[in-house]
Swiss-Prot record:
Subunit architecture: Monomer.
GO cellular component terms listed in the entry, alphabetical order: cytosol; plasma membrane
Coiled-coil segments: none
Topology term for the membrane: Peripheral membrane protein
InterPro entries (UniProt xref): G_ERA_dom, GTP-bd, GTPase_Era-like, KH_dom-like_a/b, KH_dom_type_2, KH_sf_prok-type, P-loop_NTPase, Small_GTP-bd
Keywords: Cell inner membrane, Cell membrane, Cytoplasm, GTP-binding, Membrane, Nucleotide-binding, Ribosome biogenesis, RNA-binding, rRNA-binding
Domain of life: Bacteria
UniProt region (G1), positions on chain: 15-22
Residues where GTP binds: 15-22, 62-66, 122-125
Species per Swiss-Prot/TrEMBL record: Pelobacter propionicus (strain DSM 2379 / NBRC 103807 / OttBd1)
Protein name: GTPase Era
Region of interest (G5), ranges: 152-154
Length: 296
């Protein structure tokens, strides 16, 4: 790549759930803009992160994991991921380096796309025998004409700088679209709601994380500089309310405390966070609610 040529482009990060797509985006951007957990299907929306390079700018798009659809919400998530295959300059297909060789993923997702695709083998730090990595790279290369196959660890950062440098070589010429101090085009209210939802994913189990949506009802800055936020945790069934609140309110307090810590880091100021719980029965199957919560 010629260093004196300005570059700008869109790069979509796609793959199955729980392969480290959001962790990779956060690592590239250098800040937490996409939530993560050890549960699949944590990401529900397309998340854009903006990375500036010496001679240009890259907009990376994190996407929901591609999975079987069991609800309107799931379908909307997969539709968002598949939409991210279009109108971009490059695709990064992220897979678990130690996982199965997923020929169906390649066939269903990449079949017919004319966009250049790089394969990103993530979590290589978890492979005890590096010879396995070479075997996996060879096996994947038989499935699709990937432009590059790049082993990385989004968690530790291993190989990520090299990935960014390689991506730059595939960008078209162009001028930056965003100011160089912008990390994402997402509104703060959206990121705040996501940070609360992340804590629910990390602290609760079974169906609770998947039955939860979060909406920020108010967001105001007080004269003393404290930001006061009121957010609703929306559940699908009345019997879930006691679980999210917990004994003597302990679970709700824990969610709020951990979320407030992240929100204060995001906003750079003290935060007063009020959480309350309400029931929106079967919201994941109701088109009106999916639109209200930003999932359609």
């Amino acid at each position: 790549m010629k260093n004196n040529v300005n570059r700008f482009g869109y790069v979509s990060i796609v793959g199955r759930p729980n392969v480290g797509k959001s962790t990779l985006l956060n690592r590239i951007i250098g800040e937490k803009i996409a939530i993560t957990s050890d549960k699949p299907q944590t990401t529900r929306n397309r998340i854009q992160g903006i990375h500036n390079i010496a001679n240009g700018q890259i907009v990376f798009i994190d996407t929901p994991g591609i999975h079987a659809c069991h609800s309107r919400l799931n379908k909307g998530m997969v539709d968002a991921a598949l939409a991210a295959l279009r109108g971009v300059d490059l695709l990064l297909l992220v897979v678990d380096a130690g996982g199965a060789i997923d020929d169906r993923l390649v066939r269903d997702v990449l079949g017919g796309t004319g966009t250049p695709v790089m394969l990103v083998l993530n979590k290589v730090d978890l492979l005890a025998d590096k010879r396995v990595l070479l075997e996996r790279m060879a096996a994947w290369s038989q499935l699709y004409p990937f432009r590059e196959i790049l082993p990385i660890s989004a968690g530790s950062g291993e190989g990520v700088d090299g990935l960014i440098e390689t991506v730059c070589g595939y960008l078209p010429e162009g001028q930056p679209l965003f100011p160089d101090d912008i990390l994402t085009d997402l509104p703060e209210r959206f990121i705040v709601a996501e940070m609360i939802r992340e804590k629910i994913f990390r602290l609760t189990r079974d169906e609770i994380p998947y039955s939860t949506a979060v909406t920020v009802e108010s967001f105001t800055e007080r004269p003393n500089g404290v930001v006061a936020i009121s957010a609703a945790i929306c559940l699908e069934r009345p019997n879930q309310k006691g679980i999210i609140i917990g004994k003597k309110g302990e679970m709700l307090k824990k969610i709020g405390s951990q979320a407030r810590h992240d929100i204060e880091r995001l906003l750079g100021t003290r935060v007063f966070l009020e959480l309350f719980v309400k029931i929106e029965e079967n919201w994941s199957e109701r088109t009106s609610k999916l639109r209200e919560f930003g999932y359609e």
